[in-house]
Protein backbone atom coordinates (compact mmCIF):
# COMPACT_ATOMS: atom_id res chain seq x y z
CA UNK A 1 0.00 0.00 0.00
CA UNK A 2 1.09 3.58 -0.64
CA UNK A 3 2.95 5.15 2.27
CA UNK A 4 3.88 1.82 3.91
CA UNK A 5 7.54 0.85 4.27
CA UNK A 6 7.55 -2.91 4.88
CA UNK A 7 10.08 -3.88 2.18
CA UNK A 8 12.73 -6.13 3.69
CA UNK A 9 10.84 -6.62 6.96
CA UNK A 10 10.17 -10.26 7.73
CA UNK A 11 7.44 -11.85 9.88
CA UNK A 12 9.67 -11.97 12.96
CA UNK A 13 10.48 -8.28 12.70
CA UNK A 14 6.82 -7.40 12.19
CA UNK A 15 5.89 -9.48 15.25
CA UNK A 16 8.54 -7.67 17.31
CA UNK A 17 7.29 -4.28 16.14
CA UNK A 18 3.70 -5.26 16.90
CA UNK A 19 4.78 -6.23 20.40
CA UNK A 20 6.43 -2.84 20.94
CA UNK A 21 3.32 -1.14 19.60
CA UNK A 22 1.02 -3.04 21.97
CA UNK A 23 3.26 -2.40 24.99
CA UNK A 24 3.74 1.31 24.30
CA UNK A 25 0.38 2.24 22.78
CA UNK A 26 -1.87 -0.24 24.59
CA UNK A 27 -3.16 -1.80 21.39
CA UNK A 28 -2.67 -1.90 17.66
CA UNK A 29 -3.80 1.29 15.85
CA UNK A 30 -7.46 1.04 14.85
CA UNK A 31 -8.62 4.63 14.35
CA UNK A 32 -8.26 7.14 11.54
CA UNK A 33 -7.58 10.82 12.16
CA UNK A 34 -11.22 11.57 11.41
CA UNK A 35 -12.35 8.96 13.94
CA UNK A 36 -9.82 10.27 16.47
CA UNK A 37 -11.27 13.77 16.24
CA UNK A 38 -14.82 12.44 16.52
CA UNK A 39 -14.05 10.24 19.54
CA UNK A 40 -12.25 13.11 21.28
CA UNK A 41 -15.05 15.57 20.54
CA UNK A 42 -12.85 17.96 18.56
CA UNK A 43 -12.60 19.15 14.99
CA UNK A 44 -10.40 17.49 12.40
CA UNK A 45 -8.35 20.69 12.26
CA UNK A 46 -7.68 20.55 16.02
CA UNK A 47 -6.65 16.90 15.75
CA UNK A 48 -4.27 17.75 12.91
CA UNK A 49 -2.71 20.62 14.88
CA UNK A 50 -2.37 18.34 17.92
CA UNK A 51 -0.58 15.64 15.95
CA UNK A 52 1.74 18.07 14.22
CA UNK A 53 2.59 19.85 17.50
CA UNK A 54 3.44 16.45 18.96
CA UNK A 55 6.23 16.31 16.39
CA UNK A 56 4.87 13.71 14.00
CA UNK A 57 4.42 13.76 10.24
CA UNK A 58 0.99 14.55 8.80
CA UNK A 59 -1.30 11.59 8.16
CA UNK A 60 -4.25 11.48 5.79
CA UNK A 61 -7.68 11.67 7.47
CA UNK A 62 -8.57 8.10 6.44
CA UNK A 63 -5.28 6.39 7.40
CA UNK A 64 -5.54 3.99 10.37
CA UNK A 65 -2.89 5.27 12.75
CA UNK A 66 -4.35 5.97 16.21
CA UNK A 67 -5.38 4.24 19.43
CA UNK A 68 -7.48 4.98 22.51
CA UNK A 69 -4.38 6.51 24.13
CA UNK A 70 -4.36 9.12 21.38
CA UNK A 71 -8.05 9.80 22.04
CA UNK A 72 -7.36 10.41 25.74
CA UNK A 73 -4.39 12.68 24.98
CA UNK A 74 -6.39 14.73 22.48
CA UNK A 75 -9.24 15.05 24.99
CA UNK A 76 -6.78 16.39 27.58
CA UNK A 77 -5.54 18.90 25.03
CA UNK A 78 -9.10 19.96 24.26
CA UNK A 79 -9.67 20.50 28.00
CA UNK A 80 -6.77 22.96 28.07
CA UNK A 81 -8.42 24.84 25.21
CA UNK A 82 -11.85 24.88 26.87
CA UNK A 83 -12.57 28.41 28.10
CA UNK A 84 -14.91 27.02 30.79
CA UNK A 85 -12.08 24.96 32.28
CA UNK A 86 -10.07 26.28 35.25
CA UNK A 87 -6.89 25.26 33.44
CA UNK A 88 -7.76 26.90 30.13
CA UNK A 89 -4.87 28.30 28.10
CA UNK A 90 -4.65 30.23 24.87
CA UNK A 91 -4.45 28.03 21.80
CA UNK A 92 -0.92 29.21 20.99
CA UNK A 93 0.22 28.39 24.53
CA UNK A 94 -1.22 24.88 24.37
CA UNK A 95 0.57 24.21 21.10
CA UNK A 96 3.79 25.59 22.61
CA UNK A 97 3.50 23.16 25.54
CA UNK A 98 2.94 20.26 23.15
CA UNK A 99 5.95 21.28 21.08
CA UNK A 100 8.08 21.53 24.23
CA UNK A 101 7.11 18.00 25.24
CA UNK A 102 7.49 16.53 21.76
CA UNK A 103 10.89 18.14 21.14
CA UNK A 104 12.19 16.96 24.50
CA UNK A 105 10.78 13.45 24.11
CA UNK A 106 12.16 13.06 20.59
CA UNK A 107 15.66 13.81 21.85
CA UNK A 108 15.17 11.75 25.01
CA UNK A 109 14.09 8.51 23.33
CA UNK A 110 16.91 8.87 20.78
CA UNK A 111 19.41 9.36 23.60
CA UNK A 112 18.03 6.38 25.52
CA UNK A 113 18.02 4.06 22.51
CA UNK A 114 21.53 5.05 21.43
CA UNK A 115 22.79 4.50 24.98
CA UNK A 116 21.22 1.03 24.99
CA UNK A 117 22.72 0.20 21.58
CA UNK A 118 26.18 1.39 22.63
CA UNK A 119 25.97 -0.62 25.84
CA UNK A 120 25.05 -3.80 23.94
CA UNK A 121 27.73 -3.20 21.33
CA UNK A 122 30.46 -2.79 23.93
CA UNK A 123 29.39 -5.51 26.37
CA UNK A 124 28.58 -8.16 23.76
CA UNK A 125 31.20 -7.12 21.17
CA UNK A 126 28.55 -6.58 18.49
CA UNK A 127 28.66 -4.48 15.35
CA UNK A 128 26.17 -1.61 15.12
CA UNK A 129 23.53 -3.51 13.13
CA UNK A 130 23.63 -6.53 15.43
CA UNK A 131 23.44 -4.31 18.51
CA UNK A 132 20.34 -2.58 17.14
CA UNK A 133 18.65 -5.91 16.41
CA UNK A 134 19.35 -7.06 19.97
CA UNK A 135 18.09 -3.71 21.27
CA UNK A 136 14.82 -4.19 19.40
CA UNK A 137 14.43 -7.59 21.06
CA UNK A 138 15.28 -6.41 24.58
CA UNK A 139 14.03 -2.83 24.88
CA UNK A 140 10.64 -3.93 26.23
CA UNK A 141 12.28 -4.94 29.51
CA UNK A 142 13.20 -1.29 30.14
CA UNK A 143 9.95 0.42 29.13
CA UNK A 144 8.16 0.38 32.49
CA UNK A 145 11.28 1.44 34.40
CA UNK A 146 12.06 4.29 32.01
CA UNK A 147 8.44 5.46 32.12
CA UNK A 148 8.45 5.57 35.92
CA UNK A 149 11.77 7.40 35.97
CA UNK A 150 10.48 9.93 33.45
CA UNK A 151 7.51 10.77 35.66
CA UNK A 152 9.76 11.02 38.73
CA UNK A 153 12.38 13.21 37.06
CA UNK A 154 9.73 15.54 35.60
CA UNK A 155 8.16 16.06 39.03
CA UNK A 156 11.54 16.61 40.67
CA UNK A 157 12.60 19.19 38.10
CA UNK A 158 9.24 20.96 38.22
CA UNK A 159 9.51 21.18 42.01
CA UNK A 160 13.04 22.53 41.65
CA UNK A 161 12.18 25.25 39.14
CA UNK A 162 9.13 26.31 41.15
CA UNK A 163 11.36 26.64 44.20
CA UNK A 164 13.90 28.74 42.31
CA UNK A 165 11.15 30.91 40.86
CA UNK A 166 9.61 31.49 44.27
CA UNK A 167 12.98 32.48 45.73
CA UNK A 168 13.71 34.81 42.83
CA UNK A 169 10.42 36.70 42.87
CA UNK A 170 10.52 36.94 46.67
CA UNK A 171 13.94 38.60 46.49
CA UNK A 172 12.97 41.07 43.78
CA UNK A 173 12.40 44.65 44.73
CA UNK A 174 10.79 47.33 42.64
CA UNK A 175 12.15 46.90 39.13
CA UNK A 176 12.11 48.72 35.86
CA UNK A 177 9.45 47.66 33.41
CA UNK A 178 9.06 48.11 29.71
CA UNK A 179 8.33 46.18 26.55
CA UNK A 180 12.03 45.95 25.61
CA UNK A 181 13.37 44.90 29.03
CA UNK A 182 14.72 41.36 29.23
CA UNK A 183 13.02 39.99 32.36
CA UNK A 184 15.56 37.59 33.88
CA UNK A 185 18.92 38.39 35.45
CA UNK A 186 21.22 35.41 34.94
CA UNK A 187 24.90 34.52 34.97
CA UNK A 188 25.90 32.35 32.05
CA UNK A 189 28.67 31.38 29.72
CA UNK A 190 30.20 28.86 27.38
CA UNK A 191 32.97 26.30 27.73
CA UNK A 192 34.39 24.91 24.49
CA UNK A 193 37.14 22.59 23.36
CA UNK A 194 40.18 24.36 21.92
CA UNK A 195 40.99 23.55 18.25
CA UNK A 196 38.29 20.89 18.18
CA UNK A 197 38.00 20.58 14.39
CA UNK A 198 41.73 20.14 13.91
CA UNK A 199 41.96 17.68 16.78
CA UNK A 200 38.96 15.62 15.64
CA UNK A 201 40.35 15.11 12.14
CA UNK A 202 43.20 13.01 13.47
CA UNK A 203 41.10 10.88 15.83
CA UNK A 204 39.43 7.52 15.37
CA UNK A 205 35.68 7.19 15.82
CA UNK A 206 36.16 5.51 19.20
CA UNK A 207 38.62 8.14 20.42
CA UNK A 208 36.39 11.01 19.28
CA UNK A 209 33.35 9.45 20.95
CA UNK A 210 35.33 8.92 24.15
CA UNK A 211 36.51 12.54 24.20
CA UNK A 212 33.05 14.02 23.56
CA UNK A 213 31.37 11.76 26.11
CA UNK A 214 34.02 12.63 28.68
CA UNK A 215 33.63 16.34 27.96
CA UNK A 216 29.84 16.32 28.19
CA UNK A 217 29.61 14.02 31.21
CA UNK A 218 32.19 16.03 33.16
CA UNK A 219 30.48 19.28 32.21
CA UNK A 220 27.07 18.05 33.34
CA UNK A 221 28.43 16.65 36.60
CA UNK A 222 30.37 19.77 37.57
CA UNK A 223 27.69 22.24 36.48
CA UNK A 224 24.74 20.54 38.17
CA UNK A 225 26.56 19.43 41.33
CA UNK A 226 27.56 23.04 42.07
CA UNK A 227 24.09 24.49 41.64
CA UNK A 228 24.01 25.68 38.04
CA UNK A 229 22.23 24.20 35.01
CA UNK A 230 23.16 23.05 31.53
CA UNK A 231 21.29 25.05 28.89
CA UNK A 232 22.54 22.99 25.97
CA UNK A 233 25.49 21.12 24.55
CA UNK A 234 26.68 21.91 21.04
CA UNK A 235 29.12 19.15 20.16
CA UNK A 236 32.38 20.71 21.29
CA UNK A 237 30.79 23.31 23.60
CA UNK A 238 28.46 23.51 26.57
CA UNK A 239 26.38 26.48 27.72
CA UNK A 240 25.70 26.82 31.45
CA UNK A 241 23.51 29.19 33.45
CA UNK A 242 22.92 30.14 37.08
CA UNK A 243 20.66 32.46 39.01
CA UNK A 244 23.68 33.57 41.07
CA UNK A 245 26.94 35.09 39.82
CA UNK A 246 29.15 33.55 42.49
CA UNK A 247 27.72 30.11 41.81
CA UNK A 248 28.49 30.62 38.12
CA UNK A 249 32.05 31.75 38.91
CA UNK A 250 32.57 28.67 41.06
CA UNK A 251 31.17 26.45 38.30
CA UNK A 252 33.22 27.80 35.41
CA UNK A 253 36.54 27.83 37.27
CA UNK A 254 35.94 24.32 38.60
CA UNK A 255 34.90 23.02 35.18
CA UNK A 256 37.93 24.43 33.37
CA UNK A 257 40.17 22.95 36.06
CA UNK A 258 38.48 19.54 35.99
CA UNK A 259 38.51 19.17 32.21
CA UNK A 260 42.21 20.01 31.95
CA UNK A 261 43.60 17.50 34.42
CA UNK A 262 44.24 13.78 34.37
CA UNK A 263 45.17 11.39 31.55
CA UNK A 264 42.12 12.41 29.50
CA UNK A 265 42.77 16.14 29.81
CA UNK A 266 40.96 18.35 27.29
CA UNK A 267 42.16 21.88 26.60
CA UNK A 268 39.23 24.27 26.93
CA UNK A 269 38.42 27.96 27.20
CA UNK A 270 35.40 29.64 28.75
CA UNK A 271 33.34 32.78 29.34
CA UNK A 272 31.10 34.21 32.06
CA UNK A 273 28.70 37.16 31.81
CA UNK A 274 26.00 38.44 34.15
CA UNK A 275 23.06 40.22 32.55
CA UNK A 276 19.46 40.15 31.45
CA UNK A 277 18.04 37.44 29.20
CA UNK A 278 14.73 36.09 27.99
CA UNK A 279 13.89 32.39 28.18
CA UNK A 280 12.07 30.70 25.31
CA UNK A 281 11.75 27.07 24.23
CA UNK A 282 14.11 25.87 26.94
CA UNK A 283 16.86 28.21 25.75
CA UNK A 284 17.92 31.75 26.67
CA UNK A 285 18.47 34.71 24.38
CA UNK A 286 19.63 38.30 24.48
CA UNK A 287 22.71 40.51 24.24
CA UNK A 288 24.17 38.81 27.32
CA UNK A 289 24.25 35.48 25.49
CA UNK A 290 25.79 37.07 22.41
CA UNK A 291 28.51 38.70 24.49
CA UNK A 292 29.32 35.44 26.29
CA UNK A 293 29.62 33.70 22.93
CA UNK A 294 32.09 36.30 21.65
CA UNK A 295 34.11 36.36 24.87
CA UNK A 296 34.82 32.63 24.77
CA UNK A 297 36.28 33.13 21.29
CA UNK A 298 38.65 35.72 22.76
CA UNK A 299 39.91 33.42 25.51
CA UNK A 300 43.28 31.68 25.35
CA UNK A 301 43.49 27.92 26.04
CA UNK A 302 42.72 27.44 29.71
CA UNK A 303 41.41 31.00 30.04
CA UNK A 304 38.09 32.40 31.23
CA UNK A 305 36.89 35.74 29.89
CA UNK A 306 34.38 38.18 31.39
CA UNK A 307 33.02 41.59 30.52
CA UNK A 308 33.92 44.55 32.73
CA UNK A 309 30.58 44.69 34.59
CA UNK A 310 30.79 41.02 35.54
CA UNK A 311 34.43 41.40 36.57
CA UNK A 312 33.59 44.36 38.82
CA UNK A 313 30.68 42.47 40.38
CA UNK A 314 33.01 39.63 41.34
CA UNK A 315 35.68 42.03 42.65
CA UNK A 316 33.13 43.70 44.92
CA UNK A 317 31.50 40.47 46.09
CA UNK A 318 31.95 38.75 49.48
CA UNK A 319 34.02 36.05 47.74
CA UNK A 320 36.39 38.41 45.91
CA UNK A 321 39.40 36.93 47.71
CA UNK A 322 38.79 33.57 46.02
CA UNK A 323 39.43 35.00 42.55
CA UNK A 324 41.97 36.95 40.56
CA UNK A 325 40.44 39.29 37.97
CA UNK A 326 42.46 41.22 35.41
CA UNK A 327 41.96 43.41 32.37
CA UNK A 328 43.03 41.98 28.99
CA UNK A 329 43.93 43.58 25.68
CA UNK A 330 41.17 45.04 23.55
CA UNK A 331 39.82 42.73 20.83
CA UNK A 332 37.41 43.05 17.93
CA UNK A 333 34.36 40.85 18.46
CA UNK A 334 32.16 39.85 15.53
CA UNK A 335 28.94 41.86 15.63
CA UNK A 336 30.00 43.80 18.73
CA UNK A 337 33.02 45.78 17.57
CA UNK A 338 35.85 46.52 19.99
CA UNK A 339 35.52 45.06 23.48
CA UNK A 340 37.88 44.75 26.44
CA UNK A 341 37.71 41.27 28.01
CA UNK A 342 38.66 40.55 31.59
CA UNK A 343 40.23 37.34 32.86
CA UNK A 344 39.09 35.19 35.78
CA UNK A 345 41.26 32.81 37.79
CA UNK A 346 40.72 31.07 41.10
CA UNK A 347 43.22 31.89 43.84
CA UNK A 348 42.02 29.26 46.32
CA UNK A 349 41.91 25.51 45.66
CA UNK A 350 38.85 24.15 43.88
CA UNK A 351 36.44 22.75 46.45
CA UNK A 352 35.51 19.12 45.90
What label would you give each PLM region?
Residues 50, 219, 235, 272, ...:
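Residue-level signature of catalytic and energy-coupling elements of molecular machines
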Residues 196, 248, 277, 310-314:
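A generic structural signal for short hydrophobic patches within well-formed alpha-helices
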Residues 223-249, 258-291, 340:
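Catalytic core of nucleotidyl cyclases, primarily class III adenylyl/guanylyl cyclases
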Residues 224, 297-298, 316:
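Solvent-exposed polar/charged
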Residues 302-352:
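Cytosolic regulatory/linker segments at or just downstream of nucleotide-handling modules
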Residues 278-300, 305, 332:
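Catalytic-core segments of nucleotide cyclases and related cyclic-nucleotide turnover enzymes
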Residues 174-252:
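Catalytic NTP-binding/metal-coordinating core of nucleotidyl cyclase/transferase enzymes
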Residues 1-38, 43-173:
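Arg/Lys-rich, alpha-helical DNA-contact motif
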Amino acid sequence: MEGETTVGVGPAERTTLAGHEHLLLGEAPSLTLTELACRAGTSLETAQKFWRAMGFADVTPDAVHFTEQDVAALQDTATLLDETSESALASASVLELLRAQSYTMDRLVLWELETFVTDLSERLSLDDTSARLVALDRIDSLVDLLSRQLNYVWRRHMASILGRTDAEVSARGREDTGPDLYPLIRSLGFVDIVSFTQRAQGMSKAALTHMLEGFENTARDVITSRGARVVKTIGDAVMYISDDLLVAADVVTALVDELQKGPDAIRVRASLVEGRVISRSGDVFGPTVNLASRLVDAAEPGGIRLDEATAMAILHSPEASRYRVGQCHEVVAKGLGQIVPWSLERTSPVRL
